[in-house]
A protein has these predicted regions:
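Proline-centered flexible-loop/turn and helix-kink motifs
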Residues: 18-21, 98, 193-194
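ATP-dependent adenylation/nucleotidyltransferase module used to activate substrates
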Residues: 2-33
Length: 223
């Protein structure tokens, strides 16, 4: 989803750069990792597993989404600030008992404690504060025609089934499981050579049965 989300990230940054005098902007990176906001986390088998996954996401964020935002935003001449990754905030939130971070997505929304902290100040309208999470990488597109489906249709025209089955095996580290990831990997290898070890693993949501990291592919996801 990092590559998918980079497109929306880049276009929003481009619009800001072309239509305002802003040079430094805030973004929401880190909130899902620190505050347990990803939809799949509601399937954590116990509070301990939820806490462990949150800490892992925070530890590895510089490999994925933060790097994506930095490149997408700075390429448009802007500087990003990530308040949810403030060291004091991260340290404090990770110290909160995991039992208080559990959510079901219905009676208790993801990032409940973060939402509740702003509930009595009037800083945010309720329709923004209490709306359901909308996955960014697919949230740039309609539910009838998701962004990841658009990309996959494009890739199908570029990569044949035979090529995918035959050539993906040359990548021993993080072997591509989908044509889309194989397409990205080919571009990466052309630009950066054999440096795939820089990424420790291919990110996928835990505790769910899916081959695609898109939140819209998860059972129970609603926007």
């Amino acid at each position: 989803t990092t590559v998918r989300a980079s497109v929306g990230n880049y276009l929003v940054s481009k619009f800001i750069a072309e239509n305002s005098n802003c040079k430094v902007i805030f973004n929401g990176d880190g909130a899902d990792e620190v505050c347990c906001g990803y939809v799949y986390l509601k399937n954590a088998p116990n509070p301990e597993a939820l806490q462990k996954e949150s800490e892992k996401l925070v530890k590895e964020i510089y490999y994925f989404d933060v790097l994506r935002s930095d490149r997408s935003i700075s390429s448009n001449g802007l500087e990003a600030r990530t308040p949810f990754l403030d060291k004091a905030f991260v340290k404090y939130y990770l110290s909160i008992p995991a039992e208080l971070k559990i959510f079901d997505g219905i009676n208790r929304l993801e990032k409940y404690l973060l939402r509740k902290a702003f509930d009595s100040h009037g800083l945010l309208p309720n329709e923004a504060l209490w709306r359901r999470k909308c996955a960014f990488s697919d949230g740039v597109s309609s539910q009838n025609k998701s962004w990841h489906h658009i990309i996959q249709k494009f890739v199908d025209q570029k990569i044949s089934d035979d090529e995918f089955i035959r050539e993906r095996k040359i990548f021993n580290h993080c072997m591509p499981q989908l044509k889309e990831s194989y397409y990205y990997r080919k571009i990466f290898e052309q630009l950066f050579g054999n440096n795939e070890q820089l990424i420790p693993h291919f990110w996928m949501p835990k505790w769910v049965k899916t081959q695609d990291p898109s939140a819209r592919e998860l059972t129970g996801y609603q926007e």
